[in-house]
Amino acid sequence: MVENMSDHSTRRNGKASAESPQNTEHEVLASVLRLRDDALQVLLWQRAREPHLHRWSLPGGRLADDEDVETSIRRQLAEKVDVRHLTHVEQLGVFSAPDRHPSSRVVASAFLGLVPSDVDPELPSDTRWHAVDELPATAFDHEDIALASRERLRAKLSYTNIGFALVPHEFTISTLRRTYTAALGYQVAPTNLQRVLARRGVLEPTGRSLPAGPAGGRPPALFRFTCRDLRITDPFAVLRPPNAPS
């Protein structure tokens, strides 16, 4: 029996065509966090096109051929949402679920970015800060990425000096306590926090203080972090809520 080679070739080519992979696109996204009004907030903007038109999403975009991922996300934050003053940026992870984008194959390199509480960038009209605990409906898997960035921050508050990236250069212990409380999601005792950070060598007094309040009393002392670059200070430490089992 002689097989019809043209039919076999057609079937083979048809199968190959049906199984040929899509071109994979690469995007960069940033979950930029800050502390304001005693809440941890994330920066979101509204999509201007389908899919997920008008849904809130993390800022970012496609990776250019001549950029590495961190250069790309810093550029896109500056150009698209006018966020230029980031005290800390680190890669959060790669999000590559095949169905994360409804119409194409898109792999995302996501970053955690931090903005200090005394910096208030002038945002475009389609961009706002949202409380991480009260996120609106978001596009794609961006809620998962935002929540992952919160967990990364919480973990690093335990064993690094990353708190420097959330506060002004000088601050009171009360401000620092509110920052850690909002970021960690539970109450933090100011005296314990001061003692832990001082023991690790990351916190020092400036010798200055704020003016006393209307009720009088001792003027609040000002402190600062000894280093404003990320440092691992206690690799095995885990901060826990009060009365939590160890």
Where are these regions (language model features)?
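Actinobacteria-biased recognition of intrinsically disordered, low-complexity terminal regions
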Residues: M1-N23, R34, R231-S246
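N-terminal strand-loop-strand
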Residues: S17-W56
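Active-site segment of metal-dependent pyrophosphate-handling enzymes
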Residues: T24-V28, Q41, E70-R74, A78-E122, ...
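Short histidine-centered catalytic/ligand-binding loop motif
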Residues: L58-D66, A165-L166
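NUDIX/MutT-family hydrolases
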Residues: A110-L112, P121-S158, P168-S174, T179, ...
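Short helix-coil junctions and helix-kink-helix linkers
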Residues: R178-Q187
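Long, intrinsically disordered, low-complexity Ser/Thr/Pro-rich regulatory/activation regions
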Residues: P205-S246
